[in-house]
Amino acid sequence: MAARHHTLSWSIASLHGDEQAVGAPLTTTELTALARTRLFGATGTVLMAIGALGAGARPVVQDPTFGVRLLNLPSRIQTVSLTMTTTGAVMMALAWLMLGRFTLGRRRMSRGKLDRTLLLWMLPLLIAPPMYSKDVYSYLAQSEIGRDGLDPYRVGPASGLGLGHVFTLSVPSLWRETPAPYGPLFLWIGRGISSLTGENIVAAVLCHRLVVLIGVTLIVWATPRLAQRCGVAEVSALWLGAANPLLIMHLVAGIHNEALMLGLMLTGVEFALRGLDMANTPRPSPETWRLGPATIRASRRPELGASPRAGASRAVKPRPEWGPLAMLLAGSILITLSSQVKLPSLLAMGFVTTVLAYRWGGNLRALLLAAAVMASLTLAIMAILGWASGLGFGWINTLGTANVVRSWMSPPTLLALGTGHVGILLGLGDHTTAVLSLTRAIGVLIITVMVCWLLLAVLRGRLHPIGGLGVALAVTVLLFPVVQPWYLLWAIIPLAAWATRPGFRVAAILATLIVGIFGPTANGDRFALFQIVDATAASAIIVILLIALTYTRLPWRPLAAEQVVTAAESASKTPATRRPTAAPDAYADST
């Protein structure tokens, strides 16, 4: 047993521990502090939205604020606008941090209060200009290329639309000649938006933000259900995952298609695991793979006094249970669709496949059979989608498009850049490109090995599939050739539904705050260094003053517990925690 505790699978599984599913209700003092915290965060997002009028990624043409006296003012005082945006983002992040006091403690806020808080914080950003990124303009250009009958996987905005096109003008120069790196589902949706809005940039941007809102809604729906499946408190998972500042800043304000990818993936995983739980799928055989679990149990265990022949005769006329199969099929379809937005979410299909193989016996034969079935289903869905959209499988050839970016957040890329600079200093020449290809290849190899090992751990019942998926995505993000701030959400959101140890949550919080606050500016490529420095210094002073002014009114410190405990609180001190319903014996190391 002591040796077992030193295994890697045990170390990963130890990140999870069942926690109290429902906390005691908040006291009057805590409810007041919660309301003030909610207002503090909402004020921050309002400041972000106002500052975005000058510091956001506004379009080059068709800017609706141009010439409007009040709305055009922020664009004339860009340093002030950047200060407002930065200050608002810090206020929202600090409010989120204080909100954690009401989601991780013994007394917790209700799910409804957390949902309303998230909605309140997002509302100002839904009508604000894009922030932190201009990717949405690439979405518009690539979708317009498809609407014009060209292949967005072969031509970029400049060659497909022309340099003077209204969409191309707003696309960053780095991406004007590159084909689309996104899946056919996303480009198909974008083509529909282009058909609906034409060349109206504002309407098209708002439609893409609506798509993001749909994705966020799916995330909010799926995350607490996955958390409940893993024995984790719903509000804890939602706070760390769906209410994460990175989601608000980059997916909502920045309009990134990761929202749709994650929403479809998480919803698909929940549906698939629910179907497998409902069926308790037995090992497949010609006699049993079309029977419902009740019929199979009856055929294997005839009633007392009944002859084996009688039990067999009852199994001849089974009543199939199509519900579990439909849920598994729906989940698999949603996961595959998510991969047709961005490919990394296809990892979820691997973990659903291993759970299915575990249900079928957990041996090599079961794994090969489950892999063949799920791979065939996945390829069929991709083929149908490629045929329906007219885009085929061209996306395979553009998967490496983003590798032209040299991201300092990617350890393989950072290592190569550092090595290249050392070589230059030593007079050995600039070998950065060669080293970059080597370090990135090693990173991809490590990702492949780790994902295969995690799949094997789930197959053997040593790791919960949600935990395996989250860790696999974390490894993928860590060693990916290109890492953007919002990529951290690939791992944080699924892990928030499974990992409960303080070490993980502290690491996730620190990563969120460091990347969210000290990462990008609202539109860094438009600002001079002195503007960024001035705005950062001014924001720091303003935030310090705000903390000083609200120190006694906001929960900057832990609130003193009230002496009187309500009857409702006493009754809810030891609620029954729902254990994972999917073969709990399979994940004994995760509890």
Swiss-Prot record:
Keywords: Glycosyltransferase, Membrane, Transferase, Transmembrane, Transmembrane helix. GO terms for cellular component: membrane. GO terms for molecular function: glycosyltransferase activity. It is an enzyme of class 2 (transferase). It is a multi-pass membrane protein. It is found in: Membrane. Residues 569-591 are annotated as: Disordered. InterPro entries: MptA/B-like (IPR049829). The chain crosses the membrane at residues 40-60, 80-100, 117-137, 201-221, 235-255, 259-279, 321-341, 367-387, 408-428, 441-461, 473-493, 502-522, 527-547. Residues 574-584 have a biased composition (Low complexity). Its EC number is 2.4.1.-. Catalyzes the addition of alpha-(1->6)-mannose residue. Belongs to the MptA/B family. This is Alpha-(1->6)-mannopyranosyltransferase Rv1459c.
